[in-house]
A protein has these predicted regions:
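Feature captures hydrophobic
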Residues: 1-152
Length: 152
């Protein structure tokens, strides 16, 4: 599956996910102060694997416990702003995090989930990162991606 097909599959994912972030009191509380004194955007890079032929790159513009916007980036598209953190792993590792409902920090410590950028910031806001992961796991697009396709 290439980017164009992923985009069709995603439907209203970006709006729905952003709305769910903004409606989460748990995330809002855990992310209080995020992006206020520093750039708050992050990117999840889910490396192509199995049937998914293009990387899935999700840009999240976050500030002070709120979502300002989310974008599913095309393969060579630059993010609107330089993210402070990029979380990178193959799709099958992201799937494993979701299905095991594991704390992302365990995957970071084992080196299976790589962090590029300001590591200390993400560690300081680890509860917010965990809440964001929980919210992402409930999104229809990601559920379909992780369950309906062979990720290798």
């Amino acid at each position: 599956m290439k980017y164009e097909e992923l985009l069709k599959l995603s439907g209203n994912f970006t709006k729905e996910f952003c709305k769910n972030i903004n409606n989460s009191s748990e995330y809002s509380q855990a992310a209080k102060g995020w992006g206020v004194e520093f750039e708050g955007s992050i990117m999840w890079l889910m490396g192509a694997s199995g049937e998914i032929k293009d990387d899935v790159r999700i840009y999240l513009n976050l500030k002070d416990g709120k979502c300002l916007g989310i974008k599913l980036l095309a393969p060579n598209e630059a993010p609107p702003r330089n993210p402070i953190v990029i979380l990178r792993a193959p799709l099958n590792i992201w799937k494993e995090m979701r299905t095991k409902r594991s704390n992302p920090n365990q995957f970071i410590m084992s080196g299976r989930l790589k962090i590029e950028g300001n590591v200390s910031i993400i560690m300081r806001y680890s509860k917010a990162a965990t809440e964001l992961g929980k919210l992402a796991g409930r999104q229809t697009f990601l559920k379909k991606l992780f369950t309906e396709y062979d990720l290798g």
